Amino acid sequence: MKIYQQIGLYEYLYEMPIIQVAIDGIEADDLIGHIVHQDYYSGWQKIIVSSDKDFFQLVSDETSVYRPIQDTFISVITLLEQDKIHPNNYALARAMVGDKSDNLAGVPRIGMKTVAKLFPYLSESKQYDAD
């Protein structure tokens, strides 16, 4: 996207009922993760527009991810049906599977189906850690 397109998009979004936040030196994904967990926005329906699977760990009853290229919404139910993994445990599952776009090697020959089969409790809302 060219800079003049970004400026035009910014101006267009400014006229819409869409909250925009930008902070110098802070990556957008970190900012989005922070905002989603703020008490101020509790009770709001939040939609993250991105094709990045990293945002799946932020999905909740109040937060969904819209994937524009696939034209799909990802919700808690969608993740449970699709991957058998609850969003609270999605980061742990992705760490096992790996993610080339994030230079995360993962465990060889392990995919989401295998993770869900070996660790069925990751479908629970209780958050598990790698420890």
Residue ranges and their predicted role:
Residues K2-D131:
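Extended two-metal-dependent nuclease catalytic cores across DNA- and RNA-processing enzymes
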